[in-house]
Design a protein with these regions (language model features):
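Glycine-rich active-site loops that engage anionic ligands at enzyme catalytic sites
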Residues: 1-242
Length: 242
């Protein structure tokens, strides 16, 4: 039984959006992540893709095997008998090294001023938090995470930058993220991780929606050393739970 209200909305002629309450909520999103796995398993023959997001679950089905109305009835029946698997909700926690050097953290001063903090205090606050991955998207391997502490939840730039370096660690309001490739972007950049977040030769990132990220501070020497190891495939991401 699901304790959240939800609606079904058509997504083209071969898709369904299951839409949950409009909020950024970890418990709600964990239900969405779990449903994605269970629906993928239960209806594997009829569906082609399942895409979880902040508050929606999009299911694409094979129109040769079912119709929108038939599949809606099946989903309603499935959801009415849904039982949570708490083990799946736990996720894994990854430790991500971040260099907060001023060359990398180009918005550190502004975000510190926004939060009435010193840069040192900002780094401590940012790195002590655990960030939940709500969804992957926008770019291959881009992590949409929350929840950024209110004190430093500075809105995104009014005018996006034309280029953000790969590995940039950023915030935008209550959201946190890591840029996997060079890209335009309007989020506030606090630092940079030396690890490769996406490469075409390894298209699947090590973490996924439902996991957690814990940042920890490194200096420039450590950044260079880890980057060298990572370039040769010798750096192992630390998983501290899950």
């Amino acid at each position: 039984m699901i304790n959240y209200k939800y609606d079904f909305i058509p997504a083209g002629d071969q898709g369904i959006h299951i839409v949950f309450p409009e909020q950024i909520d970890i418990s709600e999103n964990q239900i969405i992540q779990e449903l994605a796995h269970q629906i993928q398993s239960e209806f594997n023959y009829e569906i082609t893709d399942v895409v979880p997001a902040y508050r929606t679950l999009t299911i694409n089905f094979d129109i040769r095997k079912t119709t929108y109305y038939e599949f809606c009835l099946k989903l309603k029946n499935f959801l009415s008998h849904y039982v949570s698997d708490k083990k799946h909700n736990q996720g894994r926690t990854f430790e991500i090294p971040v260099c907060y050097d001023s060359e990398f953290g180009i918005d550190l001063e502004d975000v510190a001023a926004f939060g009435n903090l010193s840069v040192k205090e900002l780094i401590k606050l940012h790195s002590k938090n655990n960030y939940f991955i709500y969804m992957m998207g926008f770019l291959p391997g881009f992590t949409f995470m929350g929840n950024v502490p209110d004190q430093i939840a500075m809105p995104r730039l009014s005018v996006p930058r034309s280029s953000i370096a790969p590995g940039s660690v950023a915030i935008a309001g209550k959201q946190a993220g890591m840029y996997p490739v060079d890209s335009p972007g309007g989020w506030r950049i606090l630092g940079r991780t030396p690890i490769t977040l996406y490469t075409p030769s390894r298209p699947l990132p090590p973490f996924q929606a439902g996991d957690w990220v814990k940042f920890y501070q490194i200096d420039r020497a450590e950044y260079s050393a880890i980057k060298e190891l990572d370039a040769h495939g010798e750096y192992q991401l630390k998983i501290i739970s899950g």
